[in-house]
Amino acid sequence: MNILLAMIPAFFWGTTYAVTQYTLADWPPLLLGAIRALPAGLLLLAFKPSLPKAQDWGVLVRLGFINIATFFVLIFVMALTLPSAISGVGMISVPVFAMLYTWLRYKKRPGRLQAVSGAALIALAWMLFDPRSISLNPVGLAAMLGAISCIIVGSSLTKSLGERIHWWTVLSWQLILGGAILTLAAIIHSMIQPAQYAAAIEQLSMTNVLGLLWVVLLNTALGYGLYVWLLQRMSVVDFTFGGIANPVAGIVSGLLLLGESFTPVQYSLMVGMIAMSLLPQVVDSLRSQAKAQTHAQIN
């Protein structure tokens, strides 16, 4: 049941790209990031008030800058420059980059299965993103790599906090601080290039409002809130299984909202990437179940 619940935030996150293109196509990424982060953070804070200790503000500001301000802007750049399916499937390569980061920084070599599945995922991604078979915006691809880097560095920084700061406090305040940074950046940017901001405000439509509500309430407030709640009740491995809903949502929402279509070979490559990203967790789970059954039989 928890795995099914874990699919809910993953599904909403996967719809970000198509919903943004469909409802907010001409909006500046800085403005979108600010609107997504700050209201959601304030909602979560109102739901469960918390205040960080004085010594924790510095790390929360860094988290807000990396996890929220930079990451959200890059996500919206991807949403506005890449097909939804490509964005959703591309982001499942995070474990491969995390594996390489851990290997290079902490000298922790990956397991054989992790290495094989990672190599296969890279090969499939190389074929999917081959410019000879599909035309992709290089700005969007650079934003994807940047977003993946934010996840890895931000997760490493968050993990270093240990038990010092409650998860809810970290979540609420990194959204608020990241949203504040984005708001300031958007104000400065609007002074330099006011036309895009003026157009977004003057031409505000019900479609825009629905898109903003989806991104703020479902993608962020509900998605991140449920994410934190579930992590307290299930293992990270189990939660990873729910993550399959992310690329699937990207593919389906891109098809329904934007009319995106790909060749059978490209869809096969997407399915292969999803399978390779899940393979190590599936095998580890099966091994754990087998060990538990063996231990129970012995006792």
Model-derived features: positions:
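Transmembrane alpha-helical segments that form core, pore/gating elements
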Residues: 18, 40-44, 98-99, 136-194, ...
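Specific alpha-helical transmembrane segments that line the substrate/conduction pathway
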Residues: 31-42, 76-109, 113-115, 147, ...
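Hydrophobic/small/kink-forming positions within alpha-helical transmembrane segments
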Residues: 11-14, 18, 38, 45, ...
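Specific transmembrane alpha-helical segments of multi-pass solute transporters/efflux pumps
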Residues: 12, 16-17, 45-91, 125-127, ...
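Juxtamembrane helix-entry segments on the extracytoplasmic side of multipass membrane proteins
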Residues: 1-3, 25-30, 34, 53-58, ...
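Hydrophobic transmembrane alpha-helices of multi-pass small-molecule transport proteins
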Residues: 44, 110-130, 244, 253, ...
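Hydrophobic/aromatic residues within transmembrane alpha-helices
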Residues: 23, 32, 36, 77-78, ...
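Helix-helix packing/entry segments at the starts of transmembrane helices
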Residues: 33-35, 72, 87-93, 157-180, ...
